[in-house]
Structures are given as C-alpha cells and as structure tokens.
Amino acid sequence: MKLQCVSLWLLGTILILCSVDNHGLRRCLISTDMHHIEESFQEIKRAIQAKDTFPNVTILSTLETLQIIKPLDVCCVTKNLLAFYVDRVFKDHQEPNPKILRKISSIANSFLYMQKTLRQCQEQRQCHCRQEATNATRVIHDNYDQLEVHAAAIKSLGELDVFLAWINKNHEVMFSA
C-alpha cells in the first residue's frame, strides 16, 4: 500500500513538473559566448556613448519595459529584440572607425546566431508571443522612431549592455567555443 501511494505521489509530481510553464522550464537555450559579446561591447562602449547627443533619452527604458517581462514572454521578447538590433540598429548605424565596425559586426554575427537558435525553438513551439511581449517590443520600436535614425542607432548601440544583462538574467545560456 505504501509503495503504491509513493508511486502515485511520484507520478503526480512528475506530471505537475512537466506541465508547469514557469521561470526555469521550457525556456530556450541560447548557445553562444555571451562573455565574448560583452567584451566586444565594452571595448567600444565609451566611443559609441560619446556620440550620443541625447543622454537623457532611453530606447530600451530598462525599468519600464524589460523589467516587467514575464518568464513566459522572455523568448518572444528576446527574439524580437534580436531582430530589432539586426534589422534596424546595426543596419542604420554607419561607423567610420574600422575597429569599432569590426566589433559591431562581431556582435551582429553573434545576434544572427542567437536568432537561428530561437527560430529553432519557435519551430518546436517553445517560443510563444503573447500580447504583452508584442506591446513591450512595440514600445522599444516607438522610442527608436522618435529619434532621427542615426541618433536612434547610436542610442540603441550605447544601451546594448542593458539588453545583454537582461539576456544573461533571463535565459539559460550555454557557452559555445
């Protein structure tokens, strides 16, 4: 009788754990070297932020937009922000300094790789986009659109550390060599 109760309890626990969609479960694994991306950004951060002509304006608005993202929306928001940086920020930014351009290109390539990883996750139906996630991304695009394109690209590049810290906090990151 005790063995049967323990077996039923164990089975029930396993079923609950498998069906729960909480902070640690069913998140997409980002397989990339985040430390390398962060290092690349730190090497150019000062030069990028020195070009920022709107120091009191934010695009990512850390407290208002990214901090309120629910665990269920992390994959979608990450996917959307990677697309935002790849499709808008990196394309809109025109960098004359070859050293900075190489670092930005390296970061962009890493973002493309992360996009590929999240696309696979989405194909497995593990990356849902709820209205809250779409709204958060829209706020960031609206903030970007309020500035002139060049200024918005500089501002967004200067805030890249905010996005990288958010990825580290909200994703299981597996470092690849």
UniProtKB/Swiss-Prot annotation:
Q: Which GO molecular function annotations are given, in alphabetical order?
A: cytokine activity
Query: What is the annotated localization of this protein?
Result: Secreted
Write the signal peptide boundaries: 1-24
Q: Where are the transmembrane segments?
A: none
Enumerate the glycosylated residues: 56, 135
Q: Does the keyword Nucleotidyltransferase apply?
A: no
Keywords for the protein's UniProt record, in alphabetical order: Apoptosis, Cytokine, Disulfide bond, Glycoprotein, Secreted, Signal
Induction of this protein: by what? by DNA damage through pathways mediated by JUN and cGAS-STING leading to production of the cytokines IL1, IL6, and IL8.
Q: What is its main location?
A: secreted
What are the disulphide bonds in this sequence?
28-121, 75-127, 76-129
GO cellular component terms attached to this protein's record: extracellular region; extracellular space
What PROSITE patterns would the database entry show? Answer: INTERLEUKIN_10
GO terms for biological process?
apoptotic process; immune response; negative regulation of extrinsic apoptotic signaling pathway; negative regulation of low-density lipoprotein particle clearance; positive regulation of intrinsic apoptotic signaling pathway; reactive oxygen species metabolic process; signal transduction
> Family, per the entry?
Belongs to the IL-10 family.
Q: Briefly, what is this protein's role?
A: Cytokine that functions as an anti-inflammatory and proangiogenic factor. Polarizes adaptive immunity to an anti-inflammatory phenotype through induction of T-helper 2 responses by both down-regulation of IFN-gamma and up-regulation of IL4 and IL13. Produced by osteocytes, stimulates granulopoiesis and neutrophil formation. Exerts its biological effect through a receptor complex consisting of a heterodimer of IL20RA and IL20RB. In turn, activates the Janus kinase (JAK) and signal transducer and activator of transcription (STAT) pathway, and importantly, STAT3.
Protein name as annotated: Interleukin-19
